[in-house]
A protein has these predicted regions:
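Non-catalytic, low-complexity flexible loops and terminal extensions
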Residues: 14, 77-81, 124-128, 136-243, ...
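Extended charged low-complexity segments that act as oligomerization/scaffolding linkers
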Residues: 157-158, 277-321
Length: 472
């Protein structure tokens, strides 16, 4: 369904640009943080189900140590490619599929001695958890305790307060609602019955219809290949965006979500009447307290938006030309404010993002239950949707040596991307956003190779940027 998650960070040394992330420095930093993150020593494996004959259940195991040589890679890319950003490199590693029964499913890729790509399977952690690990590496690089060692062995311990973590689903502030689950199921069927395909986004994607079967001997040949495109926003543009969003009582996430929907409705799907989209939300601050300081278990849910498209198309027509300096941007900002209010209302009052999360408990525990229970539901509700996730701005000034001294190392750029989903079974375009405070922000968008045209995705990003520049 989806290969992996990548968090990429650019590290810079304030003392001298010539100091790079050498093998000795990276290994020493990992040996400092290893005891904090036993997730990096986690493997999974399948065994016959304990309750259903002929089915399989996945189990986790924790290794006491691993060899970093198996997980840390040092590569060099041409200067011309590096100058364009890490998109091509990230795309290559999005097409890396791990075998978690052999070793823990993660790699740390050091690019040109300046960039770290943390590539990992979803069971290790979510996007926010990935930033915790790269931030901890930054702390380790700035730690006075750091010592260069010759060993490539990384040791773990499970003797950590609050580990293993209680399932975050059990810590959610709202109970399972069977009624809500049934209502959502009926809602999506009603959409499919009431609307023709041309009235929905992504009705023209190319879908390879596959039979989902745990024992499918061809499954290796059918693994998703990710295509990745990027929109890079410099510090000046982001500053203008943030100030404009504040003055209009909304957020950058809601503005971007609105611009995506406006662009698709006005420029690419002029006959579309209705759209369902999802905004990924980090719910850590809403969970019941846990002994562990930072939740590493997946703690991301979604807030669904159900929108009639004529108002978005109207907003798109108003902002369709850079040369038209007299357009009325009020409708764009109104839609962005409504989206922000909708997300906040859901998380603080309606809490459907929590009850939907709980619905996972309705599934069985076997691999086959996932195939027969979860995936068909995902296909029903997501196949005409896009998804947006924003990790926000990383604040490197918070990651300094614990002794209060000036930090030698800092992070100057942060990027986030999750691999494409299988077309027809989940969101067709997946937007992932991250940046650094007072620095650049990168919007990555991915999709399955062959499902959409490269020109289509490039054009979507170009028009989003055109409208963004016009309204800020």
């Amino acid at each position: 369904m989806q290969a992996n998650v990548i968090i990429a960070a650019t590290y810079a040394n304030a003392k001298a640009e010539s100091i790079v992330l050498s093998k000795e420095l990276v290994y020493a930093a990992l040996q400092l943080i290893g005891p904090q993150y036993p997730e990096l020593g986690t493997t999974t494996f399948c065994r016959p189900s304990e309750t259903k004959s002929g089915q399989h259940r996945r189990w986790s195991a924790f290794l006491r140590e691993i060899n970093m040589d198996d997980h840390v890679k040092f590569i060099n890319i041409p200067a011309e490619e590096e100058a364009k950003g890490l998109t091509a490199t990230m795309e290559r590693y999005h097409n890396l599929w791990f075998e978690p029964s052999v070793r823990p499913a993660w790699q740390l890729v050091v690019v040109n001695g300046r960039h770290l790509l943390f590539v990992y399977d979803h069971y290790i952690t979510d996007g926010r958890g990935g930033t915790y690990i790269l931030e901890s590496i930054l702390d380790a690089l700035n730690s006075p305790k750091q010592e260069l060692v010759n060993s490539s062995i990384l040791e773990f311990t499970t003797e950590i307060k609050g580990f293993p973590e209680e399932d975050p689903i059990k810590r959610a502030p709202a109970p399972l609602s069977l009624f809500q689950a049934i209502l959502n199921y009926l809602r999506f069927w009603a959409i499919l019955l009431l609307y023709r395909q041309k009235h929905l986004f992504f009705h023209d994607v190319v879908i390879k219809d596959l039979k989902l079967d745990y024992k499918n001997p061809q499954k290796e040949a059918n693994l998703v290949r990710t295509r990745l495109h990027s929109l890079r926003l410099d510090a000046s543009t982001m500053k203008k965006c943030v100030l404009a969003c504040r003055s209009h009582q909304t957020t950058f996430t809601s503005l971007l979500h609105t611009l995506i929907k406006v662009t698709l409705a006005a420029d690419f799907y002029p006959q579309a009447k209705f759209n369902h989209s999802t905004t990924v939300v980090d719910i850590r601050s809403y969970l019941k307290p846990n002994d562990r300081e930072k939740t590493m278990e997946t703690a991301a849910s979604i807030v669904s938006s159900w929108d009639w498209l004529p108002q978005f198309r109207k907003a798109g027509e108003q902002t369709a030309s850079e040369d038209n300096a007299t357009f009325d941007a009020n409708l764009v900002w109104e839609l962005a404010r409504k989206h922000r209010a909708h997300v906040l209302n859901d998380m603080n009052h309606r809490k459907t993002c929590f009850t939907a999360w709980h619905s996972v408990d309705l599934l069985g525990q076997d691999e086959e239950d996932y195939i027969t229970g979860f995936i068909p539901g995902l296909k029903l509700c997501q196949r005409n949707a896009f998804s947006l996730s924003n990790l926000g701005a990383f604040r490197p000034n918070q990651s300094v040596g614990q002794d209060g001294r000036n930090a030698d190392w800092t992070i100057t750029s942060l990027e986030f991307s999750a691999g494409a989903y299988k077309t027809g079974y989940a969101a067709n375009l997946v937007f992932n956003v991250a940046g650094v405070q007072d620095g650049p922000t990168t919007v990555h968008v991915c999709y399955e190779e062959g499902a959409l045209g490269d020109d289509f995705v490039d054009s979507v990003l170009e028009r989003i940027k055109m409208r963004m520049d016009a309204i800020i």
